[in-house]
């Protein structure tokens, strides 16, 4: 079998062959129960659930592919809610004619990330659609996690809190911009796609109170901060020069006239906590090499009108608006 055929979606021999020969070599070890439409699992305590769909193009990009992205993206949504990712459900929409070699490459990435995340698969589904109905491959995931750090909410911001950023921003969005065929830029910049739970677990196990936490995906840093300001009815002031930004990312943004604060990230989080706890939080984060750039970028102030203000090195301020319009479709 060199490519996916419509017969691979008929529920018969061809479907069984696709599952057994292509999917199972990579995913079998993670599946909770075979031959069941709805596997059972025990749950005690508080849990959280997140569903996401992945339609990124190209399927393979600098720093990852749709396989790595779908596991990390779904697990990260659970992690930033204070949860430990435990289970994943996956649905694959395959285009007729999709190369089996490409599918295997993506499944191998999924296998690698599932192992890293210690995730189990509860259920798995495949559908095949006629050529042209989708662009090669779409993946839907649902992640289930157990809350180990309760009390995290976008409604919990208060004056006197510090805003911490875990790493340099806009690398995923900028690298995707550079890769698209219509923008012929040569760069070694890679997506920041990664699992966030290993970075967050030490914080969760500490005695620190985390008030708000979010991964800055679509809409970037600007989207997260504006959602927080509106949900908690506060003013957030960000020091522009404190936001870590790679030179390559900065260059791409300047050439293309992009605002790095609105570009997507896939391995960066923002958190809010009491200012007095910020030094300890940074110490914990920076003990992991992948969070060496973590820093305080701003603070929460009292204000009757929710807003996000960006202050430059000269003290001039401007409003950082919620992103509007479609900058780059199919970013994740």
Predicted regions and their residues:
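Flexible, glycine/charged-enriched surface loops at secondary-structure junctions
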Residues: 30-35, 118-124, 207-216, 237-240, ...
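N-terminal amphipathic/basic leader segments beginning at the initiator methionine
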Residues: 1-22, 320-328
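Solvent-exposed alpha-helices and their adjacent loops that cap or buttress functional pockets
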Residues: 31-33, 40-44, 114, 130-136, ...
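Acidic, Ser/Thr/Pro-rich beta/coil linker or hinge segments at domain junctions
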Residues: 287-332
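Glycine-rich phosphate/pyrophosphate-binding loop regions near the starts of catalytic domains
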Residues: 5, 13-165, 171
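Active-site-proximal betaalpha loop/short-helix elements
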Residues: 95-97, 189-265
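Phosphate/diphosphate-binding glycine-rich loops and adjacent basic-rich segments that engage nucleotide
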Residues: 146-192, 311, 330-332
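Helix N-cap motif at beta-to-alpha junctions
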Residues: 273-279
